[in-house]
């Protein structure tokens, strides 16, 4: 998989974490840098680990002969479904919750969000098990880009940018669908 595709894939799966970081950033009143680092670190670790787990699961099924004949469609379906769900979720109403900021790092919500936003990375990892790719490069890229975008997202949210999260999620969904379509196109044109 070329570097540009890995980069775009990483941005696509990082969009949910970015959006959550923007939302969480709007609630941070004190200790922004420390809390943004923790949030970004948790998101980055989950986004790096989940595609590895998904890839292992996918490789288990890739050895089955009939699956090898439709693997490109499986990758497209997984990426397409995840991308479509991201776009759908961006248009759903958000829960209004009152957040009291006491200045402490809140690990439990960050871990729950990290897990929730990395489910798409698990599905992407499963899809990538059916194509020729260095999963370690992909996982590292996903983790680092998610970390960086989550830091930026928390900063944007802290400084009043709550509207960016929705559009980042939509863009991420479009990117994932595009990559899935490209996998099918490359297979059919080979």
From Swiss-Prot:
Entry keyword Lipoprotein: no
HAMAP family assigned to the protein according to its UniProt record, in alphabetical order: MntP_pump
Record field: transmembrane: 3-23, 37-57, 72-88, 111-131, 138-158, 164-184
Keywords for the protein's UniProt record, in alphabetical order: Cell membrane, Ion transport, Manganese, Membrane, Transmembrane, Transmembrane helix, Transport
One Pfam family, short name: Mntp
Similarity annotation: Belongs to the MntP (TC 9.B.29) family.
Name of the protein in its database record: Putative manganese efflux pump MntP
One Gene Ontology molecular-function label: manganese ion transmembrane transporter activity
UniProt GO cellular component terms: plasma membrane
Disulfide bonds: none
Species assigned in the record: Corynebacterium glutamicum (strain R)
Biological classification of the source: Bacteria, Bacillati, Actinomycetota, Actinomycetes, Mycobacteriales
Gene behind the chain: mntP
Role: Probably functions as a manganese efflux pump.
Subcellular location: Cell membrane
Topology in membrane: Multi-pass membrane protein
Keyword NAD: no
């Amino acid at each position: 998989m070329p570097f540009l595709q890995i980069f775009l894939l990483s941005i696509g799966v990082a969009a949910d974490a970015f959006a959550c970081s923007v939302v969480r950033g709007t609630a941070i009143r004190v200790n922004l840098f420390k809390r943004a680092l923790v949030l970004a670190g948790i998101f980055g670790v989950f986004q790096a680990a989940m595609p590895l787990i998904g890839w292992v699961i996918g490789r288990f099924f890739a050895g089955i002969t009939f699956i090898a004949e439709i693997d490109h469609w499986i990758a497209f379906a997984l990426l397409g479904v995840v991308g479509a769900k991201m776009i759908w979720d961006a248009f759903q109403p958000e829960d209004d919750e009152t957040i009291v900021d006491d200045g402490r790092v809140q690990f439990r919500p960050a871990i729950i969000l990290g897990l929730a936003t990395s489910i798409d990375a698990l599905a992407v990892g499963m899809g990538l098990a059916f194509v020729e790719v260095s999963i370690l490069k992909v996982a590292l890229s996903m983790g680092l880009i998610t970390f960086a975008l989550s830091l930026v997202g928390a900063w944007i949210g802290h400084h009043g940018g709550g509207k960016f999260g929705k559009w980042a999620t939509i863009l991420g969904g479009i990117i994932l669908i595009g990559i899935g379509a490209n996998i099918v196109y490359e297979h059919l044109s080979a």
